[in-house]
Amino acid sequence: MSSFIKGNARFSVLTEGCIRIEYALDRCFADDPTLFAVRSSFCQAEITEDKDTLTVKTKKLTLRYTGSEPFSRDNLSVAVHTSGKDTIWHYGDESRNNLGSTLSTLDGVNGERPLPDGILSRDGFYVIDDSGKPLLHDGWLKARPGEHKTDLYFFAYGTDYKSALRDLSYVSGKMEMPRKYFMGSWYSRWWPYTSDEFLAIADEYALHDFPLDIMVMDMDWHYQDWSHREGHPRALFGYGHAGENIGWTGYTWNRTLIPDPEKLIDSLHKKGLKVVLNDHPADGIRDHDEMYSDFIADLKSKGYKEEVPTVEEKVSAAERENLSRNIENYRFNAGNRDYMETFFKNAHRRIEKQGVDFWWLDWQQDRIYPHVHNMPGLLHLPWLNHLYYENSKSGNKRGMSFSRWGGIGDHKHPAYFSGDAATGWETLAFEIKMTATAGNIGCFWWSHDIGGFFDPVPGGQAECYVRWVQ
């Protein structure tokens, strides 16, 4: 077993090309997994001490740490032995020749954007910083002790980029095989379709002998403000989105458009289609939703009390105008296990029993509260991607998710969609580049809105649309 403690530092050799580097003030190191790292088994290495210097050597790298002080450029270095020459990294050095990876989303993007780092670099090495990120214990988040200051993963590979991706998969976990039908043809349009219109679309595909495998129902499958009619259930609590539409989140079928959801889903299944529902969960289950009473009762039976502070400047006008109702609603709380288990039970499981095959997580609410409650530094998106993917495995099915890219380590939760990009030649060119470089961080399954999402091309967009299809 190749793990060695020197003072407050621990070095763990995970593969010939990857070493974990930790520093903890109390010498209590982290063995639980994180959203990024899942492996803790070790690879053999040659470990020696000469006076005050520790040397850890494998076929691909040699690490040297002198003294016992916190890491600095002067006391920690790694030599990379690949491609016939040594490249030296000192603590704090940045990747100067990185080949890039991919953006989390193309929301609002119109043209080229800088790409974040991937694991592949012409430098022949890369460092992933997992410092401060929450641990996973018994399937849930656990804050990392404040004394655990540094947690780095050094990848050494030279020009052998395949070995870098192989080591990434070993350390962070392999990407599971997606469901077969995911590879098929999808139909998705943000439009208030009726049941008859959904069925007509499926029939038209069949009439033209064009394959269709997945029918996506965007936000209008549930009641929401823009299509609100007198007598419809209406949200009066929440932050909302896009001009204070607080019906952006919802879990009650719009019976005007889809009077019999089970019948519609069954009909689509008989036509060979899978059914996916759009989900903006940021406002959670509220009192206008048909499962509200069960949801509240379940939460109270677990002793749950509101713990997410209200962001006053983001509260919708509708909520402010209806404070006198005194109806109990809870803010969405992805950081609380009782809340999320109750949410999945009362929203997702109930609707999945009607035949829905999986969910499209359309998270856009980082503007309100980017970080998971009680977990500083953890964005909602990677954590929700993990939760949604794991919850999609019910009934012994393969996991299936559809969301924006959550960053390093999120390759374990396929697949991804790039969001609301502008229509235009510059965006198309960048999208092609970004899709290719996504592989540099293990993001292998990208879906894009064909033709973009907003802004027409001056002079017509027919050719741009056709090129997008290509």
Briefly describe each language-model feature range.
Residues E176-H371:
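Aromatic-lined carbohydrate-binding/catalytic grooves of carbohydrate-active enzymes
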Residues L14-D52:
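A low-complexity, Ser/Thr/Gly/Pro-enriched, surface-exposed linker/loop concept
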